[in-house]
């Protein structure tokens, strides 16, 4: 099977995979021949693409990451705000993925606009589990992580759909309302005795950045749990690769470029590195352009060697880019999409990454009000790195490039880290 974007879908193509609505009902079944009417309707519903059968892709089989029934049960429990059931589904997701020798993340997600919030939560849960497995988490910690991922956006159910799906940029008031969703999610869980404090904190803090510029508490990376840092990466990746009313989807390659560019600013470098080992940049069944002018379909990805897959070529042959004779052939990155803001609840993220070439200023101050004030003054022209103490600053400097300028207040007797 081959993935075809909805813009490239044509009447007469034969569907290779079922398409479902937000209630889990089959809209169009596999084996159905696409018509112009079907394509228009799928486009209206917001599907980014479809899987089709053709001669070149007949030996490409793409396995769903988790069973469709389990995915639909996950949609339902999030949609119905069933917190206890979410915890049960999280455990089933962990058990399912741990029981498999190889976890396949090759399938491009197929969903409509209407089920975005529910599908997003399930996708983030699966991504978090795979990253957590790669980082050696115990089964208990994986259950906590995946439960938090399923619950992380419950607060969005209280935000009007016209704001969630607004085609244009959010107003300042709308953006502030959107930013309350993590706190709303936490409040829904706060009095639940059977939900651990670790899960609640992960839900509350999943929009924190490692440089302290996130929300709601402005925590530095070393103040965040590993679960928080994992959910943040998975959340942004899935948001970027999703088609929304206000943007086209990023390709996996473009989304990973975004994550890499924001390491040390938004994301934990170690988490992103494990993510890149586990998630293919070019999923199976997608067409790619080669540096020698040819095109091919991704037939097989080889673990950490995501940039050197095996391709199905139009003449029926296989091209293994790991073989020595093919080392001079590379996959060309897709053209950069001219999109609007990549995610409604964090419209400044794309700008933040694109402007990493700006001069960097590190500010060290134990007063959060001072840090916020300085950031407000400088962030339009500089990349601002905030640290609440010398220890945090030293930790940042050990793992990242030195800033162009360092501003710090006179250290208190308890904090002589930068004065030694």
Where are these regions (language model features)?
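Two-component/phosphorelay signaling modules centered on CheY-like receiver
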Residues: 368-386
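Divalent-cation-assisted or electrostatically stabilized phosphate/pyrophosphate-binding catalytic cores
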Residues: 166-184, 211-294, 303-307
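Non-catalytic interface/linker regions that flank or bridge core catalytic/transmembrane domains
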Residues: 1-118, 304, 312-354, 370
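Conserved small/polar residues in nucleotide/adenosyl-binding loops
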Residues: 408-415
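Acidic, metal-coordinating helix/loop segments flanking the phosphotransfer/catalytic sites
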Residues: 386-404
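Acidic di-acidic motifs
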Residues: 365-366, 389
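Acidic/His-rich, divalent-metal-binding segments that scaffold phosphate/diphosphate chemistry
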Residues: 54-179, 184-193, 198
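Non-catalytic signal-transmission and effector/linker regions of two-component phosphorelay proteins
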Residues: 352-362, 375, 383
């Amino acid at each position: 099977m081959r993935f075809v974007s909805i813009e490239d879908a044509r009447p007469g193509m034969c569907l290779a995979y079922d398409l479902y609505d937000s209630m889990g009902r089959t809209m169009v079944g596999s084996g159905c021949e696409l018509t112009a009417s079907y394509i228009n309707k799928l486009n209206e519903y917001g599907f980014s693409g479809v899987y089709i059968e053709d001669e070149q892709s007949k030996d490409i089989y793409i396995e769903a990451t988790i069973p469709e029934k389990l995915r639909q049960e996950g949609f339902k429990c999030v949609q119905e705000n069933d917190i206890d059931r979410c915890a049960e589904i999280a455990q089933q997701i962990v058990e399912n993925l741990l029981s498999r020798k190889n976890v396949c993340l090759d399938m491009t997600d197929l969903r409509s606009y209407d089920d975005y919030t529910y599908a997003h939560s399930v996708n983030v849960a699966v991504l978090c589990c795979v990253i957590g497995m790669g980082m050696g988490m115990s089964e208990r910690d994986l259950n906590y992580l995946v439960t938090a991922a399923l619950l992380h956006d419950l607060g969005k159910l209280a935000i009007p759909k016209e704001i969630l799906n607004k085609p244009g940029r959010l107003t300042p008031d709308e953006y502030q309302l959107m930013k309350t969703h993590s706190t709303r999610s936490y409040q829904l869980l706060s009095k639940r005795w059977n939900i651990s404090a670790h899960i609640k904190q992960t839900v509350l803090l999943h929009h924190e950045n490692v440089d302290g510029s996130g929300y709601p508490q402005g925590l530095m990376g070393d103040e965040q749990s590993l679960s928080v840092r994992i959910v943040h990466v998975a959340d942004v990746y899935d948001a970027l690769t999703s088609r929304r009313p206000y943007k086209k989807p990023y390709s996996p390659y473009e989304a990973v470029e975004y994550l890499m560019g924001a390491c040390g600013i938004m994301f934990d470098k170690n988490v992103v590195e494990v993510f890149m080992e586990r998630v293919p940049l070019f999923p199976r069944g997608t067409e790619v352009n080669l540096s020698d002018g040819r095109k091919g379909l991704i037939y097989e990805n080889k673990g950490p060697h995501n940039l050197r897959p095996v391709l199905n070529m139009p003449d029926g042959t296989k091209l293994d880019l790991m073989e020595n004779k093919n080392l001079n052939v590379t996959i060309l990155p897709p053209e950069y999409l001219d999109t609007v803001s990549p995610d409604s609840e964090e419209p400044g993220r794309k700008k933040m990454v694109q402007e990493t070439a700006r001069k960097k200023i590190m500010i060290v101050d134990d007063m959060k009000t001072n840090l916020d004030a300085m950031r407000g003054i400088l962030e339009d022209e500089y990349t601002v790195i905030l640290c609440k103490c010398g220890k945090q600053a030293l930790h940042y400097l050990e793992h990242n490039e030195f800033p162009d300028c360092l501003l710090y207040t006179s250290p208190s007797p308890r904090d002589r880290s930068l004065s030694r």
